[in-house]
């Protein structure tokens, strides 16, 4: 690992799930180059008893099991060794469907930190007391439920790592893609010029960079307005525009 490289630490019952897809393609190459590092902290050894139990029945009754606060705390303590205490420099995140929605802005903030600790839940969740005591931020990948946080953790790390300098060969690509300016990305095309009687828009073949930029901006606005009205309203509000205006998108 290169000095000062971004670090990801994962507290999980399934350390064998990593690096998973993070070990492939550009993120995998960057991992090999030492541009970032990945460490898993197995929750099981911190468990109690002969079977290293990590969970117990939910207080008040109900289905499923809950990860115990004392056991999760020991794992978080192990994960925090050598990390700064300020959460802005090193966020500690619990992946939860009730958390704050993950966003590109969040990924940018994390990429600018020194590293990140992710707690992958299982069963019915984690005892709330440890989340409160350790100032753990709850983050959601979307409005759906997974059997555990490992898949979500890989997605969040991928979105963050690709923003680290030198991970992507072309930094400009991160500036043009979806959400970089609050808009969805414009449509992309490549050769052949004609495929099944469908042609690449003429403006993209014109070589006129200003016209291409205008077309891409208009398409990005059109798609955002059609598919993500929430993003469109926020985009317009930030620019003093009426979201219902008609600009021939």
From Swiss-Prot:
> What species does this protein belong to?
Cereibacter sphaeroides (strain ATCC 17023 / DSM 158 / JCM 6121 / CCUG 31486 / LMG 2827 / NBRC 12203 / NCIMB 8253 / ATH 2.4.1.) (Rhodobacter sphaeroides)
The top EC class is transferase
Could you say which residues bind S-adenosyl-L-methionine here?
121, 141-146
Does the record carry Methyltransferase as a key word? Answer: yes
**Sorted alphabetically, which keywords does the UniProt record give?**
Cytoplasm, Methyltransferase, S-adenosyl-L-methionine, Transferase, tRNA processing
> By what name is this protein known?
tRNA (guanine-N(1)-)-methyltransferase
Family under the similarity heading: Belongs to the RNA methyltransferase TrmD family.
Q: Which domain of life is it from?
A: Bacteria
Record's catalysed reaction(s): guanosine(37) in tRNA + S-adenosyl-L-methionine = N(1)-methylguanosine(37) in tRNA + S-adenosyl-L-homocysteine + H(+)
Query: Which GO CC annotations does the UniProt entry carry?
Result: cytosol
Q: Which gene encodes it?
A: trmD
Q: Which residues cross the membrane?
A: none
């Amino acid at each position: 690992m290169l000095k000062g490289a971004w670090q990801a630490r994962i507290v999980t019952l399934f350390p064998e799930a990593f690096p998973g897809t993070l070990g492939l393609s550009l993120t995998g190459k960057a991992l090999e180059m030492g541009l970032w590092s990945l460490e898993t902290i197995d929750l099981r050894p911190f468990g109690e008893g002969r079977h290293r139990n990590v969970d117990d029945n939910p207080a008040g009754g109900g289905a499923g099991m809950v990860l115990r606060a004392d056991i999760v705390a020991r794992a978080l303590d192990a994960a925090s060794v050598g990390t700064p205490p300020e959460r802005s420099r090193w966020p500690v995140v619990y992946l939860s469907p009730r958390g704050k929605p993950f966003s590109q802005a969040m990924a940018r903030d994390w990429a600018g930190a020194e590293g990140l600790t992710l707690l992958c839940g299982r069963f019915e969740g984690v005892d709330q007391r440890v989340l409160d005591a350790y100032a753990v931020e709850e983050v959601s990948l979307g409005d759906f439920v997974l059997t555990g946080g490992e898949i979500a953790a890989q997605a969040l790390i991928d979105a963050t790592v690709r923003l680290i300098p030198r991970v992507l060969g072309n930094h400009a690509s991160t500036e043009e893609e979806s959400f970089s300016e609050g808009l969805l990305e414009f449509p992309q095309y490549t050769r052949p010029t004609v495929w099944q009687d469908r042609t690449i828009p003429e403006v993209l073949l014109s070589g006129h960079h200003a016209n291409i930029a205008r077309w891409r901006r208009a398409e990005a606005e059109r798609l955002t307005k059609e598919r993500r009205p929430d993003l469109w309203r926020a985009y317009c509000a930030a620019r003093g525009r009426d979201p219902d205006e008609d600009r021939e998108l």
